[in-house]
Amino acid sequence: MIALRDYQHELLDGIHQSMANDNKRIMVQSPAGSGKTVTMSELVRRANEKNNRVLTVVHRNELVSQISKTFSANNVNWNLSQVGMVQTISNRVKKGNVVEPRIIVIDEAHHALSKTYRNIINAFPNAYVIGFTATPCRLNGQGFTDLFDDIVLGKTVKWLIDNKRLAPYKYLSIDLINHEKLKHQRGEYSQKSISEAFDKKIYGDVLKNYEQHAKGLKTIIYAYNVESSKRVAEKFKQKGYKAYHLDGKAKTQERLEVVEKFRNGEIDILTNAELFGEGFDIPDCHCVILLRPTESLSLFIQQTMRAMRYQPNKKAIIIDLVNNWSIHELPDSDRDWLKYFEGKPPREKSEVHVKECPECLNVIFSNQKQCPTCGHDFTTETKETAYAVEDVELEEITEENIIRLQFKKPSECKSMKELYELAESLNYKPGWAYYQGKILGLIN
């Protein structure tokens, strides 16, 4: 059997209390990397002990074997349990080949509103439905109350980091794309516009920044499409790295073999196009690189936290090359998941609760009046406008959170904010930036 942690027991207690309150369909929120699969396995094991049959539904094939291994390790009774991919289970339900369960457990339950999941749920109206997710939110802002009666909330990401259940992280950010070219399609950026927003030189930038900040670390790179994923993998191979590209067209056996090679170190750079996010469990993955701009909070959290599985003395590296933090903040930002569940997102997407220090470029939470790194006083600051970044290099400013990049020369700067950043990178005083701003006509 697997020994659960205190917060996992608390989560199970919350589920049982919700069931005692006559809720039959319950969503359970717990952060990525918090051990949802272990918690699920204990829920199933306890149900089996009471002779209850449990059906567990997952949305990707490689997760079937991953979850099944955990279930076996926790002594789940396979005579009363079944784990399967949603499409497979749905087809079997239509044919009447699934024995009625007492409980339906859904992994990554933010997908559960789709037709295939509903077909399964509706086929067994008397069953309890327990859906686990790290991100109870939808791209269109609608909630989940049309399917679930209640939500049980787990510990926050900050709590898990502070209590050594998730690894702390260092967030490095640059902006290598032209955001003006990004166009929306069904609430998300279209693939065509993403491709147009990227400069071809980005593939070299990915390698350069990896070697500068994460060289030797096992890394997952989230590319924006299959072609870009292949190009990035090839760029790394040319430099002698053990890199491999995978996408949804790869056969199941190939995907499982590649994942195992990544786990045991035969592959150290894994590039993919939206394939390895949810539920992909590799504790020794130390770095993720984001090459896919997204307005999906769920996708952002799933990808950024893939490197935050806990190991002693580990610090995850998150390299954001598309400025996703400016939309979604940071992995451990406070979020009111109850409001998301109810379909009442707490604020507009454009209103972020982090800010950038104009003196040292550290990115901190907005409620801080003084920069903890350089002591800059925000109460006397004049608000600047947002800016785009071109021809830049990553530079580490602080031990954690986001580090922005520096410009090459004054003539490339389009605002005083950019000039002050350049001055900082050159170790010049702010007065130099002011003088350059006068020359460039940025100050009247």
PLM regions: where:
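Conserved pre-motif I regulatory segment
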Residues: M1-M27
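Inter-Walker segment of RecA-like/P-loop motor cores
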Residues: V64-E100
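Conserved helicase ATPase core of P-loop NTP-dependent helicases/translocases
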Residues: S65-K69, R231, K242-A273
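Post-DEXD/H (motif II) to motif III coupling segment of the RecA-like Helicase ATP-binding lobe
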Residues: H111-Y171
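A short beta-strand element within the Helicase C-terminal
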Residues: I269-N272, E278-P293, A316-D320
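Conserved segment of the helicase C-terminal RecA-like domain
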Residues: A307-D332
